[in-house]
Amino acid sequence: MFYHLFYPLSSEYSFLNVFKYITFRSAYSGVTALALSLLLGNLMIRMLQKFQIGEKIRSDGPEHHASKSGTPTMGGLLILTTFLGSTLLWANLENRYIWLIVFSVTGFAAIGFRDDILKLRKGGGISAKEKLILQILVSLAVGIYLLYFDPARSEYATRLSVPFFKEFQPDLGFLYLFFIAFII
């Protein structure tokens, strides 16, 4: 938002030219995320405690885990809020890769949210197998977009650059999708 608001004015006010630099926007995005987490963190913890949204510790678990009983869960909400807030404020929202990152983070956050909700309702979250499958699906969606729908895709899109080996760049072809799913 700040990029779209202030950068067009840089022709009249030269000090606003800093908004074109990704390093400037990245630094202030990080500062914004930190400030938001400090401002909202205690409030969110109090709200989660008020609504009794906390960890339930099994009786057959280790004794030192008993002290964690009632610890607020769903901390990912704070992370997602600060991430989305700082991204929407500082990023160039016309960049399709920003939206791809927002999709990935939101997708993984939805998986975590589902896991936390099931932990609260049933005492156990989603299985490791289901979580892995859902994460792979989000990763594959990103990979499919990058491989088949990205207008900026080049002939090097499926090549793997190996550090220190300038000439060695194997073309992964369709295996690129599995590589992306593994990396993400």
Describe these PLM feature segments.
Residues 2-184:
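"…together with the soluble PPM/PP2C metallo-phosphatase catalytic core" -> "…together
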